[in-house]
Design a protein with these regions (language model features):
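Cys-dependent protein tyrosine phosphatase-like superfamily
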Residues: 1-99, 103, 110-163
Length: 163
């Protein structure tokens, strides 16, 4: 048996991971993470195979995708979706947790970038992490969204509080 991570997989924090949408080849790898929940940041339906695997593994899927009929794929994820997602990320009851979108680049990168901003990371480091996962496909609108995100929309405490 081989253990192949999903595209753009990365560890964000202990028991918090990010990636693109997994395929059947990635299931053995993901099983090793013993995930409790997956946040899916896309409006698209998940494959029946993936949904069946989630049920078998007793992993809760939380879909926070914007309505595809009303948003351009080039626009950043909405502020409401980011705030909802960050509330889930800040709750240790949801861990181990995977944040994913189709390719693990833009929506996931924006969500993790806003988390890093809450943690007090400097903007250069946040954008470097975003670009590492987005590669040459990075989007300036997403970077601007992260830069201008209002951290006061998400109350934090403990390990998530910026110094």
């Amino acid at each position: 048996m081989s253990f192949i991570p999903p595209q753009n997989f990365g560890m964000v924090e202990c028991d918090l991971y990010r990636s693109g949408a997994p395929t059947e080849l990635n299931f053995p790898f993901l099983e090793k993470l013993q995930l409790r929940k997956i946040i899916y940041l896309a409006p698209d339906e998940c494959s029946e195979m993936f949904l069946n695997w989630l049920a078998e593994q007793q992993i809760e899927l939380i879909q926070l995708g914007d309505d595809a009929g009303h948003r351009s794929p080039w626009k950043p994820v909405s502020e409401d979706v980011v705030v909802q997602g960050l509330h889930l990320l800040l709750d240790p009851q949801n861990y181990p947790l995977l944040v994913m979108c189709n390719l693990g680049r833009h929506r996931t990168g924006t969500m993790i970038g806003c988390l890093r901003k809450l943690q007090g990371w400097n903007l250069t480091s946040i954008l470097e992490e975003y670009r590492r996962h987005a590669g040459s496909k990075f989007r300036l609108l997403n970077e601007q969204f992260i830069e201008l995100f209002d951290c006061d929309l998400v109350p934090t405490s403990g390990r998530w509080r910026a110094p």
